[in-house]
Amino acid sequence: MGKLTLLLLTLLVWLQYSLWFGKNGIHDYSRVNDDVAAQQATNAKLKARNDQLFAEIDDLNGGQEAIEERARNELSMTKPGETFYRLVPDASKRAQAAGQTNR
């Protein structure tokens, strides 16, 4: 009976070692779980960005308002009869802002 107990105990130790430290063991499972979580977070960010881009594409395809808004903001374009005003801060405020960014 002692040999059988020793054999079973040895088998148990070997199986536990394989479970904890062997290939596809607990450590590998934990590492893969972390990798999957990181990839899912990245995928969620990219999906949100894609949804935003698709919404912008639909907006640009759907009407002139989005195109007009981009032309006004990016190209400083105006409609006929409109006057474009650009507000420039005082020289003292510009110098103060420049001094803060250089620090």
UniProtKB/Swiss-Prot annotation:
Pfam families on file: DivIC
UniProt KW Protease keyword: no
Major location (coarse): membrane
Spans within the Cytoplasmic topological domain: 1-3
Superkingdom assignment: Bacteria
Any one GO cellular component localisation term in the record: cell division site
Record GO biological process: FtsZ-dependent cytokinesis
Transmembrane segments: 4-21
Membrane topology category: Single-pass type II membrane protein
Compartments where located: Cell inner membrane
NCBIfam families to which the protein is assigned, alphabetical: PRK00888.1
SUBUNIT field: Part of a complex composed of FtsB, FtsL and FtsQ.
Official protein name in the record: Cell division protein FtsB
Organism annotation: Citrobacter koseri (strain ATCC BAA-895 / CDC 4225-83 / SGSC4696)
